[in-house]
Every structure is written in structure tokens, then in C-alpha cells.
UniProtKB/Swiss-Prot annotation:
Keywords: ATP-binding, DNA damage, DNA recombination, DNA-binding, Nucleotide-binding. The keyword ATP-binding applies. This is DNA repair and recombination protein RadB. InterPro entries: DNA_recomb/repair_Rad51_C, DNA_repair_and_recomb_RadB, P-loop_NTPase, RecA_ATP-bd. Involved in DNA repair and in homologous recombination. May regulate the cleavage reactions of the branch-structured DNA. Has a very weak ATPase activity that is not stimulated by DNA. Binds DNA but does not promote DNA strands exchange. The gene is radB. Belongs to the eukaryotic RecA-like protein family. RadB subfamily. GO terms for molecular function: ATP binding; ATP-dependent DNA damage sensor activity; damaged DNA binding. It holds the Pfam family Rad51.
Length: 221
């Protein structure tokens, strides 16, 4: 297990993010998905492969989080290997290259988000197949190296169901054993994490957290 650095969230997840599996983290904009992924990598003390498809990764934010926790910002930045694919084909090449790049020095792989370029394309049928292949590569990496792979996902509004759902829900749901949803609350800075699926933890559990200069913290801290 890889700790998130948040006691209540670790307890919800059964100790942290599972090794050897894909964990999907999804939710609306600005709910803390990227912050959670970055914080987990920061606190791991090892290298992190971060695939940023939306330009959401901020070196300044990582430095702020490290400094606020008494860690060396430069050392923290040096541990993050950043990739910025510009389209779904480049994303495929980047994810494929991770099979050769990941070594025992790495503690985590993050794809943020897996569906950003997917939504920009029109040929949904072929892209669903392409997305499935990329997820299979990520699952291979997770299993081979016994590390967590975090797959961050966006949401869309399903008019028929009258609620938001994760993009490419079936494709990701088939391969992601653990699914965590993040949502906003009316109170500024406060968020809720809901465990929608887990290999051994009860589904539907939830915890509250806040976003601070340190990253993500328990609301009681």
C-alpha cells in the first residue's frame, strides 16, 4: 500500500493505494484529484512517472506542498518524471515507453487524465479500443513492478440518468479494481471522497478532507 498522507483516506482505502492494481480517481473540476496524486508521489520518497495530458501539473504547487511539509522542493521536483502528450497517439507512445522506463526506483505512475484527449476525438469506437490497450499496458506495469497506478478521469453529464458519470465508464471500470470519486462541498476548501469500488473494502464509504498549502489534509487537522 502507498499512503496518501491523509489518515482518514488511508483508512478508507484499506491502508493507501493498492500495489499491482489500477485505481481510478474521478470527479468534477477542482475537487483535488491532481493534488491527491501529486501528494501521494511526493510523500513516497521515490520516483514518480507523471503523464500530464491537461497541463494540470504545477511545479510551483509541488514546491509549495514540499516546503509546507518541511521537505526539500528541489529534491521533490527531481523525483517527478513528467510527460506531456499532445494527443491520443502521443499518449499511446508515452504510456508504451513506460514499460521500458519504470524501474524499482519508481513508487508510482499517474495518468492525469486518461480521457482528456479521448474526448477530443470523434471516432469513439476505435478510441475505446485504444483506451483499453493503454489501460492494459498500465495494468502490466502495475503488476510487474508491484506499484500503484493512478488513472485520473473526468466526468460528463448523463442526461438520461440525470447525473454525472465518469467518461468511458465501462472501459475504465473493467480494468480499474478500485474507484474513488471526489466531490465538492458547499463549504469552501472542503471536499468528500467516496469509495465506489474496492477489492476488499466496503463500497460507499466516505471521508471528508480539505485542500491546503500542504496539499490534502484531514478536516480535523
Amino acid at each position: 500500500m502507498l499512503s496518501t498522507g491523509v489518515k482518514s483516506l488511508d483508512e478508507l482505502l484499506g491502508g493507501g493505494f493498492g500495489e499491482g492494481v489500477l485505481t481510478q480517481i474521478y470527479g468534477p473540476y477542482a475537487t483535488g484529484k491532481t493534488t491527491l496524486a501529486v501528494q501521494t508521489g511526493l510523500l513516497s520518497g521515490k520516483k514518480v512517472a507523471y503523464v500530464d495530458t491537461e497541463g494540470g501539473f504545477s511545479p510551483e504547487r509541488l514546491s509549495q506542498m514540499a516546503s509546507a511539509r518541511g521537505l526539500d522542493p528541489e529534491e521533490a521536483l527531481s523525483r517527478f518524471l513528467l510527460f506531456t502528450p499532445g494527443d491520443i497517439r502521443e499518449q499511446r507512445r508515452v504510456i508504451g515507453s513506460l514499460k521500458r522506463l519504470i524501474t524499482p526506483e519508481f513508487s508510482l505512475v499517474v495518468v492525469d487524465s486518461i480521457t482528456a484527449h479521448y474526448r477530443a476525438e470523434e471516432d469513439w469506437r476505435s478510441l475505446t479500443s485504444e483506451l483499453g490497450k493503454q489501460l492494459q499496458v498500465l495494468l502490466w506495469i502495475a503488476r510487474k513492478h508491484r506499484i500503484p497506478v493512478l488513472v485520473i478521469n473526468q466526468v460528463h453529464f448523463d442526461a438520461r440518468a440525470e447525473r454525472t458519470r465518469p467518461v468511458a465508464e465501462q472501459t475504465l471500470g473493467y480494468r480499474c479494481k478500485d474507484i474513488l470519486r471526489l466531490d465538492k462541498l458547499p463549504t469552501p476548501g472542503k471536499r468528500v471522497a467516496i469509495l465506489e469500488r474496492h477489492r476488499f473494502r466496503p463500497e460507499g464509504g466516505m471521508v471528508y478532507f480539505k485542500i491546503t498549502e500542504k496539499g490534502i489534509e484531514d478536516v480535523s487537522d
